[in-house]
Amino acid sequence: MIRYIFITGGVVSSLGKGIASASLGALLQSRGYRVRLRKLDPYLNVDPGTMSPRQHGEVYVTDDGAETDLDLGHYERFTGVSARQSDNITTGRIYQRIIEKERRGDYLGATIQVIPHVTNDIKEFVLSDPGEGVDFVLCEIGGTVGDIEGLPFFEAIRQLGQELGPQRACFIHLTLLPYIPAAGEMKTKPTQHSVKELRSIGIQPQILLCRCDRPIPVNEKGKIASFCNVRLASVIEARDVGHIYDVPMAYHAEGLDSEVLSHFGITDAPPPDLSSWQRIAQTIKNPDGQVTIGLVGKYTDVPDAYKSVSEALGHGGLANKVKVDIRFVDSEKFDDPDAALEDLDGVHGILLPGGFGERGAHGKMRVARYARERNMPCFGICYGMQLSVVEAARNLAGIKNASTSEFGPTKEPVVGLMEEWTKGNEKVTRDASTDLGGTMRLGAYPARLKEGSMVAQVYGSLEISERHRHRYEVNASYIERLEKAGMIFSGMSPDGRLPEIVELEGHPWFIGVQFHPELKSRPFEPHPLFASFIAAAVKQSRLV
């Protein structure tokens, strides 16, 4: 029997529903249960693929090529369960699907309405394809209770709660308890009003997860329980912690997983095994050293734009038992060829993340040259790899007009638009006029590594699979000239047509990858490239 847990949020946005969902999933996993986590996003975009990182943060790509919300990255990192296209839905995708069915005549002339057609599609999404042997499906509802665009989702889960019954459905509401210094007390009224709003649409939460920055007094917990109609033990203190990987243990200490099991009447659950989380906490609290990594991109004012990269760097630190201090550096500042690169002083490694467009790209190329000439560890990802190759083509291979066609027409397209590639058994064709949404090379693709290369040593294998999200690729017709200049194309697509990994001959650690390795890194299994990169940064820190 599959049980469903719905996580909603109130009072304000950005309370951490994604981390809360991932943490609860990890706690249930630690007791031997199998979980699947899903995200329901109320916005009208079909997916976040064309949304600005400044508005939405990063786009998280799954193995099967879905462009999804960054919360799915939290789900994967905390539980190790690979997300799928079927684990993220938006209002836009639901409406798109319904309109397609209406145009085909599937509704046989019926009037299409939010209730029942939209809500039925939402319910179908929640219940469909949970996976084999899954015990719990956790569904996070994006946005805040009371948002107009979220009403169909709340109505759908209300109906599911009624249809499944309390033995199979549980509602958890994440809320805020602000502390007012002038009054010297914690205020429960926002939580009461948030729950009142939720109850007005027919949902009675069984558990309240109360975000706060200090302990909740017992009398305040009692007041919340009384006015929100929940058990006292179901008012869970979700106090701020030092690191997100402390959250599962903090929530367990407050009894969150026990309350969930109690609601479902499960009395024979095995005790949780949190030893792996405890080891991570110890490493985070007691590192053997510290390194500073310069993350050079154009969205550095919005750290969520590089969420998975930041997390993967931290995982690399865990693998090497060091703290990783990330210095976010705006690449646009370096577009001016006369601008000093003093922001890179004191860093022990440089990471050039993915991105799009010409703005900030020339600055990234200057930074790639800086790292290349100073023998500093440098890790280029996706666009970062492409720009590193363009820089080397200009300044090592002597191809003065080398550029990327992403900037516009060029005589020397060292990086060009991919027009054809293979996805499974299907040939995919694109051109410059193709729509932007969902038209990139997306999802997991295999690659073959060059025997004896640095990456082959790092991976410990000659065959790998990594996730991609790109429209441009290094032009294979330039490989011979670039290799003569000292570049090593150490990873290629199985058909030998698409360069996937590049190294720099004679450099202690200079690797560029066309894929996004950060998407497959986990705290318990740091990605080998990030572990190796941080190891190189540790070595660099001892040289300066």
Swiss-Prot record:
InterPro entries: Class_I_gatase-like (IPR029062), CTP_synthase (IPR004468), CTP_synthase_N (IPR017456), GATASE (IPR017926), GATase1_CTP_Synthase (IPR033828), P-loop_NTPase (IPR027417). One of its GO terms (biological process) is 'de novo' CTP biosynthetic process. It catalyses: UTP + L-glutamine + ATP + H2O = CTP + L-glutamate + ADP + phosphate + 2 H(+); L-glutamine + H2O = L-glutamate + NH4(+); UTP + NH4(+) + ATP = CTP + ADP + phosphate + 2 H(+). Mg(2+) binds at residues 71, 140. CTP binds at residues 13, 147-149, 187-192, 223. GO terms for cellular component: cytosol. Residues 1-266 are annotated as: Amidoligase domain. The keyword Magnesium applies. Keywords: ATP-binding, Glutamine amidotransferase, Ligase, Magnesium, Metal-binding, Nucleotide-binding, Pyrimidine biosynthesis. ATP binds at residues 14-19, 71, 239-241. GO terms for molecular function: ATP binding; CTP synthase activity; glutaminase activity; identical protein binding; metal ion binding. L-glutamine binds at residues 355, 383-386, 406, 471. Its EC number is 6.3.4.2. Homotetramer. Catalyzes the ATP-dependent amination of UTP to CTP with either L-glutamine or ammonia as the source of nitrogen. Regulates intracellular CTP levels through interactions with the four ribonucleotide triphosphates. HAMAP family: PyrG (MF_01227). Belongs to the CTP synthase family. PANTHER family: CTP SYNTHASE, CTP SYNTHASE-RELATED. CTPSs have evolved a hybrid strategy for distinguishing between UTP and CTP. The overlapping regions of the product feedback inhibitory and substrate sites recognize a common feature in both compounds, the triphosphate moiety. To differentiate isosteric substrate and product pyrimidine rings, an additional pocket far from the expected kinase/ligase catalytic site, specifically recognizes the cytosine and ribose portions of the product inhibitor. This is CTP synthase. It comes from Hyphomonas neptunium (strain ATCC 15444). The lineage of its organism: Bacteria, Pseudomonadati, Pseudomonadota, Alphaproteobacteria, Hyphomonadales. The gene is pyrG.
